[in-house]
Structures are given as C-alpha cells and as structure tokens.
C-alpha cells in the first residue's frame, strides 16, 4: 500500500527558526540582557533585606491584604523555608514568577482590552490562546533556548507564554460582562470610547481581571521546575536536581517550599479580589 508523501514540517520549522536567529540575533540578545538584568535586580534587591525582616514584611502584607490566618501561615512558612536553607532559591523563584507575571499583565491586559473592543481581533486572538494553553510546556523551551540560550531568560519566556492566556481571557470576559444598559447610558451622555473604557468598563471588570492575574501567577509558579531544565535557578532547580540525583528528601523539602510560596501568593491575590468586591458593595 502506497503511503502519502511526508510533509517536511520539521525541516521547515528548523529553517525558519535558524533564519530568525541569524537575522534578529542582536534583538534577542538585547531582550535577554534586559530580562536577565531585571530578574537579577529583583533578586539583589530582595537579598539586601535580612530574611527575618523580609519574612515579617511578607506576613504584614498578608495580614493587611488577606487575613490573620494567611499572615500566620506566611510567617511560619517563610521561616521554615529559611531554616531549611532554601531562602535564596525562593527569592530567585519569586523573581522569575514576578517578572513573568508583570510581562503577562503589561502585554496581556492591553491585548484583552483590544480584543474586547474589536470582534475581529478576538477571533484572531482566541485560537492563538488555545494553542498557547494546549501546547505542551516543554515545546516552549525549544525556541526559547534557540533565541535566548540557557539560563533564566528562556525560563521567563516559557513562563510568560504559559501564564499569559488567563489574563487576556479574563480581561475580555470582564469587559464583555459589563451590563449593556450601562454602556447605553454612557453613550446617551456622549461619553467617548476612552471615557467609557476607563471610567465604566475597566472598573467594573477589575474583579474578573484580578482573577485572571491570580491564575497567571499560579501558572507561572507551576513552570518553575520546567524552567529549571533550561538553567533557570530557584526552587525548581532544586527539585530538578533532586529528581536527577534520586534525592527524595531534598526534592520533598524544595517541593514544600514551592507549595508554601504558591499558597501564600494564591491566598493574597484572591483576597485582593474579595476586598475589591466588599468595598464596591459598601
């Protein structure tokens, strides 16, 4: 039985990636240097603060934004991380996650706003987001390595690709959920598109957008172990090293540290959303 001719898709993609690397190598080097400097700046800045003082700051922030229970959990959890010897890797992980989330917000929210205002843009963006969310995370690492070499930068890039879709989707959803009668009222009073967006739609969509940002934070944090495979430092690197060297105890310790950070960030960002809601109802 004759087989259909094979489509050389892999060869085409490899040639395309090689062409981009050769043509825009300087551009990608600039991005890599900028991202690396930003991440290192966060790590250095947090590293100047004594671990005990920074733990108290995190606990106070959790108390102010969230609840006493979360503040106590943050205090005990971060002290445990410090006494286990994973303080510096935790700071590196926080820097990677923070950088990824900032980029996701800065890029994702405007795209979400644009897609909510233009149906054509939404139809184009939606399948791209589907691809970003369904593509295996390991696949993101391949072009990231080609363009940015080994280190923290490809980890950040892969995390951004994986974590950005919820921010875009929830921004679109939040703006679309604004009641039509409010939109009609603003139009009746002669509001411009910008006035309607910034004074009505975005304030009412804030809760939904924050929910998307919360999801992006969790997805970025879930990428730390995968990012470690391309040289990104942090708690993920500790877990990856423990797996490759069959050190179960070390892997469990680093895993506990990741869980503590994840729960802390999740509860704090969730309670930002709740406080926004309660103030709006007051």
UniProtKB/Swiss-Prot annotation:
Q: Where does it mainly reside? A: membrane
Give the UniProt entry's GO cellular component terms.
ATP-binding cassette (ABC) transporter complex
Locations listed in the record: Cell membrane
What is the top-level taxon of the source organism?
A: Bacteria
**UniProt entry keywords in alphabetical sequence:** Amino-acid transport, Cell membrane, Membrane, Transmembrane, Transmembrane helix, Transport
Assembly and partners are described as: The complex is composed of two ATP-binding proteins (OpuAA), two transmembrane proteins (OpuAB) and a solute-binding protein (OpuAC).
The residues on the Extracellular side of the membrane are: 1-18, 66-69, 115-137, 237-242
Give a yes or no for keyword 4Fe-4S in this entry. Answer: no
Q: What residue ranges are annotated as transmembrane?
A: 19-39, 45-65, 70-90, 94-114, 138-158, 216-236, 243-263
Which species is listed as the source? Bacillus subtilis (strain 168)
Example GO biological process: choline transport
Q: What name appears for this protein in its UniProt entry?
A: Glycine betaine transport system permease protein OpuAB
């Amino acid at each position: 039985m004759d087989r259909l001719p094979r489509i050389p898709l892999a060869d085409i993609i490899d040639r395309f990636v090689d062409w981009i690397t050769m043509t825009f190598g300087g551009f990608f080097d600039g991005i890599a240097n900028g991202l690396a400097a930003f991440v290192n700046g966060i790590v250095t800045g947090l590293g100047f603060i004594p671990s005990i003082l920074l733990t108290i700051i995190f606990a106070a922030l959790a108390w102010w934004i969230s609840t006493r229970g979360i503040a106590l959990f943050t205090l005990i959890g971060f002290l445990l991380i410090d006494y286990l010897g994973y303080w510096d890797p935790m700071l590196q992980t926080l820097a990677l996650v923070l950088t990824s989330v900032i980029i996701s917000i800065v890029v994702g929210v405007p795209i979400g706003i644009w897609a909510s205002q233009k149906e054509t843009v939404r139809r184009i963006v939606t399948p791209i987001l589907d691809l970003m969310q369904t593509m295996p995370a390991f696949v993101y690492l391949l072009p990231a390595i080609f363009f940015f070499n080994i280190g923290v930068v490809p980890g950040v890039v892969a995390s951004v690709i994986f974590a950005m879709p919820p921010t875009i989707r929830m921004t679109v959803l939040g703006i679309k959920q604004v009641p039509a009668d409010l939109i009609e009222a603003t139009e009746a009073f002669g509001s411009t598109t910008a006035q309607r967006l910034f004074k009505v739609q975005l304030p009412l969509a804030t809760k939904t957008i924050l929910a998307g940002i919360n999801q992006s934070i969790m997805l970025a944090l879930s990428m730390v172990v995968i990012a470690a495979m391309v040289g990104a430092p942090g708690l993920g690197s500790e877990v990856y090293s423990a797996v490759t060297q069959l050190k179960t105890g070390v892997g469990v310790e680093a895993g506990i540290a990741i869980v503590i950070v994840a729960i802390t960030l999740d509860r704090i960002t969730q309670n930002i959303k709740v406080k926004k809601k309660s103030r709006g109802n007051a």
